[in-house]
Amino acid sequence: MGKTMFKKTLLFFTALFFAALCAFSANADVIITGTRVIYPAGQKNVIVKLENNDDSAALVQAWIDNGNPNADPKYTKTPFVITPPVARVEAKSGQSLRITFTGSEPLPDDRESLFYFNLLDIPPKPDAAFLAKHGSFMQIAIRSRLKLFYRPAKLSMDSRDAMKKVVFKATPEGVLVDNQTPYYMNYIGLLHQNKPAKNVKMVAPFSQAVFEAKGVRSGDKLKWVLVNDYGADQEGEAIAQ
């Protein structure tokens, strides 16, 4: 029931003059190790590791946004810096990026804060022989976007206990998910009588969300799946209230 937890957005860099003459390539050669980043408060920095599986070097650009996927990296302000923000990743090699919390923006100390780590994989420009053969070309960069959770040091419970504290309530619309914990609960599935609920999504700390399902009554058994700290599917059960 696993899902890839990061989104890939295609960004077009060069103009296409005639489609019939165009050569096309869109491979994500630089891979991020992991599907989420957790930044524990008080830690000097965290490392994001990259791997380039291609036979040629790649150029990558990294930045962090605060929830707007369309924000221009040049004007996005968050309390983090990435070193280096632009890096060359050699063929069949790896690269480490360092994320450091600057403290430039005060964050709540009683709950997690959510940001997004972005990586743009920019493919190399074709060589002279390729250009001579094909003429014009379309170059595509692939963007990966991962959740970054800033986690305060002294929360009221740990993340494993928090999963068990979420309350599920039967409503006419389906299931009201009441997350009165300091953690984001990244749900990816909810079953009622072996039927999947709709509108399943991440529920922020100390907030609620409705997952759409028909005929849910108090006392019914529910099965849920969420993504845990390690990026793995975590399954559990609950009784609707």
Swiss-Prot record:
Superkingdom of origin: Bacteria
Any one GO BP annotation for this protein: cell wall organization
Keywords, in A-Z order: Chaperone, Fimbrium biogenesis, Immunoglobulin domain, Periplasm, Signal
Cross-referenced Pfam families: PapD_C, PapD_N
Gene Ontology CC annotation, any one: outer membrane-bounded periplasmic space
PROSITE patterns assigned to the protein according to its UniProt record, in alphabetical order: PILI_CHAPERONE
InterPro entries named among the record's database cross-references: Ig-like_fold, PapD-like_sf, Periplasmic_pilus_chap, Pili_assmbl_chap_C_dom_sf, Pili_assmbl_chaperone_bac, Pili_assmbl_chaperone_C, Pili_assmbl_chaperone_CS, Pili_assmbl_chaperone_N
Function as written in the Swiss-Prot or TrEMBL entry: Mediates assembly of pili by forming soluble multimeric complexes with pili subunits as an intermediate step in the assembly process. This protein is involved in type B pili (HifA) assembly.
Identification of the protein by name: Chaperone protein HifB
Provenance organism: Haemophilus influenzae
